[in-house]
């Protein structure tokens, strides 16, 4: 029987707030423009992977925020609507960038998947060969 510690909303909000504060500081000091939210996600992911923060310390607030994610995108949608004049002026360029970026993303994802699957296949073949060699050694037949 395992007991799971329940963390208060306030402690979870403090963890998220501290990470966002750190990511805002990092974003202002970077030489390239990068959204602080992306930096915050990377920091949170790293802290979870390194087990500095346990999942249960941020899980319920993360789940709640995921539940209202559509509402959180409303300001972005409004700013896109407000920018229709600029978007109409540069429609072809914007569409070209979107299409090219999508094709590049699909190609890189496909190549990476093939690389990983090919590596996995090779490891499977190597494992089979190793088992055959080890079987031969058990029976006194060394090649």
Curated annotation (Swiss-Prot):
Bilayer topology: Multi-pass membrane protein
Keyword Transmembrane: yes
Segments passing through the bilayer: 6-26, 30-50, 61-81, 97-117
Chief location bin: membrane
Cellular component annotations (GO), alphabetically ordered: plasma membrane
Subcellular localization: Cell membrane
Alphabetized UniProt keyword annotations: Cell membrane, Cytolysis, Membrane, Transmembrane, Transmembrane helix
Family: Belongs to the CidA/LrgA family. LrgA subfamily.
Function per UniProt: Inhibits the expression or activity of extracellular murein hydrolases by interacting, possibly with LrgB, with the holin-like protein CidA. The LrgAB and CidA proteins may affect the proton motive force of the membrane. May be involved in programmed cell death (PCD), possibly triggering PCD in response to antibiotics and environmental stresses.
HAMAP family: LrgA (MF_01141)
Name used for this protein in its record: Antiholin-like protein LrgA
């Amino acid at each position: 029987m395992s007991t799971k510690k329940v963390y208060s909303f306030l402690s979870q909000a403090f963890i998220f707030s501290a990470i966002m504060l750190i990511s805002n500081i990092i974003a202002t000091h970077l030489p390239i423009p990068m959204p602080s939210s992306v930096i915050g996600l990377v920091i949170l992911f790293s802290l979870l992977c390194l087990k500095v923060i346990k999942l249960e310390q941020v899980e319920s607030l993360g789940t709640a925020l995921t539940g209202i994610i559509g509402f959180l995108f409303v300001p972005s949608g409004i700013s896109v609507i407000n920018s229709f004049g600029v978007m109409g002026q540069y429609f072809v360029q914007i569409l070209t960038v979107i299409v090219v970026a999508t094709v590049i993303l699909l190609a890189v994802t496909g190549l990476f998947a093939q690389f990983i699957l090919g590596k996995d296949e090779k490891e499977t073949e190597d494992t089979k060969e190793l088992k055959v060699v080890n079987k031969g050694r058990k029976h006194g037949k060394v090649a």
